[in-house]
Amino acid sequence: MRRILALTLIAVLALSVIGFAQAGTKANPYRLILVPSTDVAVVASTGDAIAEALTRITGLEIQAFMTPDIPAAISEYSSAEGDVFGFLSTAAYLDAFVETLDVTGKQCDFPLISVRNGYIGYWTGYYVRRDSGIETFADLDGKVWGYPYPGSTSGYKVPAAELANAGITVGGTVETGSHNASLVALYNGDVDFISAFFSPPQAPIVLRQMGFQWEPGDDLELGIWNSTPAETWGEATGRITGDLAWYVKDVREAFLLDGTYPDVVEKIGIVALSSVIPNDGVSFVPDFPAADKAAIVAAIKSFIATPEGNALFSNPNFYAWDNVQDTTDAIYDVYRQAKGYAVPER
């Protein structure tokens, strides 16, 4: 009997070890968590393509998993057993960090931050119809606000705080479901203003080659819109093309690229920006195997630098990442303090 019990115990332990060792295999794949912040179908299909590429590069089995909303993504992190990484928005990552720490007593890791248009931060843009008569942030008082969903950093959390701090009371709210859907609602006149992500206009290639780029304090639509006389500039309308073109890189870009609303710049403008928000990036749950984490990080860095990878990551209907940059979780500490999050002990 003792011999049977001993053999049974050995078998159970062996199976446990084998199960742990098989993380990253078809039987137990790593899960790449995605959030539905832009075009849900595009995010899902692009995430699948990225997961397949990372599997090919690393030899680890990786499957993309589209969560229905931010709370579901956070739950995936806090309940994971060292087998989850993801591309979470800033607010989603910070909430996942807190919940995971509460549940496990351990901290998530944040080794890569995204780069968009040369920046590792972004802003909330307050967008309005140009014919609305809304010209300043203060003019938003009493107006109907369209936002993506409550878990969105730039779409809801930051603007909600800024509107409240400024004493602005909106005349109503509409939850649209995504940044793109918010823009559609504004374009159709269903809301008076929206809050959505803003990345600065991209300078012409000849200026970029000289190191020039948009800086905070510059015209919010530099090279894109001329208010006197009112007209659009840039590649979007064909007014200026080639090496002298400026490019729209904010929430309106996707609608220009797919031709859905070719007059979106003529119809929709920006009246204000939020304070800067650190970009989203690549995060891992606690206890993710160190060697596999390093392999995945290296694979993302190499893949996004290829034409195939860059086309996937930079798609404005995905997450519009031009590149990634090494970082640590500490990059969020100033933002944590500004938004009332506790700075973790490390």
Walk through the language-model features, giving the residues of each:
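Short helix-initiation/N-cap motifs at beta->coil->alpha
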Residues: 64-79, 89-91, 168-184
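A structural signal for short loop-to-beta-strand junctions that line the ligand-binding cleft
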Residues: 104-119, 267-273
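Pocket-lining segment of extracytoplasmic ligand-binding domains
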Residues: 132, 144, 150-289
